[in-house]
């Protein structure tokens, strides 16, 4: 409870919008579970809400520049991604800016070989995503009842992925395209 409250307060102070987490559960060294997650955008609309976000991660591998996600399980997720004019900013850009370094930094020399990322299993249940982009004229709403897969190969560097089976159920996508609005029209 204490960790959840500190994380929520820190995030709210950093990004300046409402952040709510009903429960945080960490089982070292592997599992992080968030339940009752809510994140508001600067217009006080829902940016992200979720019943359960569970990530099974090999935390000790982080010490050797490796992110190994054994299982990602998302349930009851709603995400609203919106881009508007005149600034053509997304409704989550303020979060990126809040965590970005305020001082310019010199390009570090890459001597580590980079961070490797691997994903084993993904399970998604009751996912709703709204993408409303006034700049490109795309308005997409998607609902996914269920999706799960297990990767045999996951190579982000080469964009090479192999999965023997994908289970997909209850996919409903609505796309509305309008003429893209140029900045000059504003």
Task: Show the residue positions of the predicted features.
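N-terminal type II signal-anchor transmembrane helix
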Residues: 1-16, 78-80
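Secondary-structure transition motifs
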Residues: 17, 36-186
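Short extracytoplasmic
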Residues: 13-38
């Amino acid at each position: 409870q204490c960790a959840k409250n500190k994380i929520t307060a820190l995030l709210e102070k950093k990004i300046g919008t409402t952040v709510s987490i009903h429960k945080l559960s960490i089982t070292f060294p592997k599992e992080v579970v968030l339940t009752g997650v809510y994140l508001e955008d600067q217009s006080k609309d829902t940016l992200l809400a979720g019943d359960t976000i569970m990530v099974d991660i090999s935390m000790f591998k982080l010490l050797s520049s490796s992110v190994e996600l054994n299982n990602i399980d998302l349930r009851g997720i709603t995400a609203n991604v919106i881009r508007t004019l005149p600034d053509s900013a997304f409704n989550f850009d303020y979060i990126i800016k809040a965590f970005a370094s305020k001082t310019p930094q010199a390009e570090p020399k890459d001597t580590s070989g980079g961070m490797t990322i691997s994903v084993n299993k993904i399970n998604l249940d009751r996912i709703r995503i709204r993408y409303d982009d006034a700049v490109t004229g795309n308005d997409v709403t998607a609902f996914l009842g269920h999706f799960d897969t297990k990767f045999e190969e996951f190579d982000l560097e080469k964009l090479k992925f192999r999965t023997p089976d994908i289970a997909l159920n209850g996919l409903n996508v609505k796309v509305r395209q309008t003429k893209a609005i140029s900045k000059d029209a504003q």
